Amino acid sequence: MKYLIIQLLAVAFCWFAARSMRKHAIAYYVGAFALEALFLYGKFFSLPGFLWTPIFFAVDQCMLGTALFVVVMFVGVFPKNSPIAQRLRPSRGELSIFAWILCLGHLFYLTVIPRMADIAIRLGFAMPMTVVGLIVALILLVLLIVLGVTSFKFVKRAMNAATWKAVQRWSYLFYACTYIHVMLMVVPSAVYGSGQAVFTAFVYTAIFGSYAVLRVKRALAEKAEATPVAKPEVAGA
């Protein structure tokens, strides 16, 4: 239920803040970095409860960043002339960078090598799926850094257009790894009877499964549009 609430809040945030973010992107990025810095500080040290509770709710388990990426994902499969695409597509780059920043802290915390080694030793035999999930998190961190850095406009302008497009296609691998990571982290709890874990697995599967279907459908439609229609020959011409 927690993720579903954050997802609905993320959709509302993107709808109302998209135009503002496009105009004042730096301010949003600074705010996201500040939130991540507070999250990491709270994880390694401590924060007052009135600060830690909302930050933990939003940032822990990367739920807010993932929810924003879900919006970015779906904007790409809606028809360009749809109301949703017309409102959000112009700000898609800024939204993706904002989501990217909000994911960095969580993945960094998970993939600090001493921490990963400690978890692997403690859970390696009892919960191997969780250990694999941490390894996938490391892959996600690498993909996130590459995709995030190349999303900045000044980096995009400095790159060859074909190379930039090829790099951005890695986003599909990032989305797939995100789903795999979540499943590896929640399925063990679901197997042991956690209703919350079962619900989370169901919601993520529904969202990412729907995206996969819509993405394939759009790709087929784009391919059909790009294929020239042969004109019938006129008899006697």
Model features per residue range: what roles?
Residues 1-237:
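Membrane-embedded alpha-helical bundles that constitute the cytochrome b-like, heme-associated redox core
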